[in-house]
């Protein structure tokens, strides 16, 4: 079974949020979108200990825009569905027969946690729901809710620095085990040994021998085999290979992640990293032993915190093969470059709710996906985190706008503005991608026939947007001709080594300058010339474009 959607209203930092999940869901966004509140909501409602969390006054949302007014109610709704038709007949799900709701030939479960403040007391109700929101009344609702928590607990992995190696930690608040005492002691012994090895890896990696690594790998296998089933299953892959080039570039046809650990070609450092990750998973489930029938949902929180990008890629190749539903939060462009586009969800907080932007199957055709995969996901993954894309035709403009912004006192990267050269990838796929991900955009086109075609294409895609907001057309053939006519003629003559008295056509002067110097060098020379000139030579149109994109970026904070 698969967690399909969560609806949150009035919980901690989230006013309203509706978020769908895939087999792999990657969440990105700026710091204020409510990541901690979302992950806490999942962790508390699907706790491995199968205990109900008692809501506190601090769990109710405070709307600072409305004068620090605290919400009087909060609600969390989880929606589940089968991975395939007939899965509800499986032994682990048979008991939920009174609560199944059929939609689109699949069985669904709806769970609601509803809390409200009444007479300075918090009253909480938990129910299964019909599709229309009406409560399914059953005398053993709490029992079945706990059973679902046992079947699909949240296992939340954070930075290893948040994990404390405290052998004296109290576990009295949990039902620590339902296993026989001998088996429980063996599990504890294995975990203590694994903890000791991983702690030494963190402090003295050079002192861990190859034999100890091999022994620890076998230990991991014996422990994790209790929680995972590395066998064929009926879950469909997130995307076919045609939609996601290089999807399995690291796994070498390994279906079992442990096979990666024992391959001779893996470096010792890589094995240590992967062992540490898996140990973090085992520890993250807490002091409760998961049942053999459990199918955990893994939350991987900002895994780039302590991993070098190369190690991050190796770790991800290991994690992506784990046969479980995974939720990943990250600020790493390197990690975004190896996940499917359709797994990425960009969250943006607004005064009324947290908006989710994503790419669903079919919204981009195969050709569009190929282009944006190559030009954005693989070569410019940091662009996914931008607030605004400034789309330009050539390399000169990329250098020029970034450097000119510095002269006007702005840092485009700090403002969340990414300058993208679109000529090779095509314009339409980039605009479609920006709109799907909620990224603002503005195009600067040349005044030549090709530039006018780009401008016409933008006009056809405006919808309700104004042309002034989305499009700037240079009143010249290209950026070089535009600058030449705006007072930069002496510079171009100097770069082309042509005297002022030589009445050569503009076109030939610019051609000679470009032939003698690379475009980045010319762009930097233009910036230096602007900076050193006594009068303010920066063209008004360039100032206007910079001001426009900065206003757009600041308007969506």
What are the functions of these language-model segments?
Residues 247-251, 401, 406, 495-557:
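Charge-patterned, long linear interaction tracts outside catalytic cores
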Residues 336-337, 342-450:
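RecA-like P-loop NTPase motor core
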Residues 89-192:
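Electropositive, glycine-dotted interaction segments
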Residues 163, 172, 176-296:
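Extended helical coiled-coil dimerization/tether regions that scaffold
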Residues 1-27, 32-47, 251-379, 456, ...:
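Switch/communication elements of ASCE P-loop NTPase nucleotide-binding domains
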Residues 40-105:
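Conserved P-loop NTP-binding catalytic core
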Residues 453-524:
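Activity-critical C-terminal alpha-helical subdomain
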Residues 25, 80-84, 115-119:
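Beta-strand elements of well-folded, non-transmembrane domains
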């Amino acid at each position: 079974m698969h967690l399909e959607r969560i609806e949150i209203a009035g919980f901690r930092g989230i006013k309203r949020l509706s978020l769908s999940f895939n087999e792999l869901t990657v969440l990105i966004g700026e710091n204020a979108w409510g990541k901690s509140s979302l992950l806490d909501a999942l962790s508390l409602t699907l706790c491995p200990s199968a205990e109900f969390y008692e809501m506190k006054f601090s769990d109710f949302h405070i709307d600072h825009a409305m004068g620090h007014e605290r919400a009087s109610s909060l609600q969390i709704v989880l929606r589940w569905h089968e991975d395939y038709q007939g899965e509800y007949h499986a032994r682990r799900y048979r008991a939920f027969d009174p609560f199944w709701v059929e939609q689109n030939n699949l069985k669904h479960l709806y769970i609601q946690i509803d809390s409200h403040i009444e007479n300075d007391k918090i009253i909480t109700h938990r129910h299964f729901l019909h599709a229309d929101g009406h409560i399914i009344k059953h005398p053993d609702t709490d029992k079945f809710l706990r059973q679902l928590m046992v079947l699909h607990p949240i296992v939340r992995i954070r930075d290893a620095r948040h994990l404390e190696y405290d052998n004296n930690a109290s576990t009295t608040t949990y039902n620590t085990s339902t296993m026989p005492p001998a088996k429980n002691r063996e599990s504890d012994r294995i975990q203590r040994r694994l903890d000791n090895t991983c702690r030494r890896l963190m402090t003295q990696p050079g002192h861990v021998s190859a034999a100890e690594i091999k022994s620890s790998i076998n230990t991991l296998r014996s422990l994790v085999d209790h929680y995972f089933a590395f066998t064929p299953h009926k879950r469909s892959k997130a995307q076919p290979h045609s939609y996601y080039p290089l999807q399995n570039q690291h796994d070498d046809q390994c279906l079992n992640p442990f096979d990666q650990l024992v391959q001779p070609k893996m470096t010792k450092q890589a094995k240590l990293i992967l062992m540490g990750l898996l140990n973090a998973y085992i520890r993250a489930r807490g002091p409760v032993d998961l049942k053999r029938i459990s199918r955990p949902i893994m939350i991987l929180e900002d895994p780039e915190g302590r991993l070098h990008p190369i190690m991050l890629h190796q770790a991800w190749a290991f994690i992506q093969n784990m046969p479980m539903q995974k939720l990943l939060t990250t600020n790493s462009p390197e990690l975004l470059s190896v996940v499917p586009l359709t797994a990425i969800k960009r969250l943006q907080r607004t005064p009324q709710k947290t908006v989710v932007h994503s790419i669903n199957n079919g919204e981009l055709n195969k050709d569009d996906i190929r282009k944006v995969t190559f030009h954005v996901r693989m070569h410019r993954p940091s662009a996914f985190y931008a607030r605004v894309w400034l789309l330009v035709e050539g390399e000169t403009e990329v250098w020029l706008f970034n450097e000119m912004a510095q002269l006007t006192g702005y840092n485009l990267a700090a403002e969340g503005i990414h300058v993208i050269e679109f000529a090779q990838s095509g314009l339409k796929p980039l605009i479609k991608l920006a709109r799907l991900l909620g990224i603002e955009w503005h195009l600067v086109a040349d005044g030549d026939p090709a530039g006018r075609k780009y401008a016409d294409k933008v006009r056809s895609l405006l919808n309700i947007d104004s042309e002034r907001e989305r499009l700037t057309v240079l009143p010249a053939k290209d950026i070089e001709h535009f600058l030449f006519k705006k007072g930069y003629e002496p510079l171009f003559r100097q770069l082309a080594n042509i005297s002022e008295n030589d009445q050569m056509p503009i076109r030939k002067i610019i051609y000679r300058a470009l032939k003698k110097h690379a475009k980045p060098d010319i762009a930097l020379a233009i910036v230096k010339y602007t900076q050193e000139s006594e009068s303010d030579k920066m063209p008004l149109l360039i100032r206007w474009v910079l001001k426009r994109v900065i206003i757009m970026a600041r308007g969506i904070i």
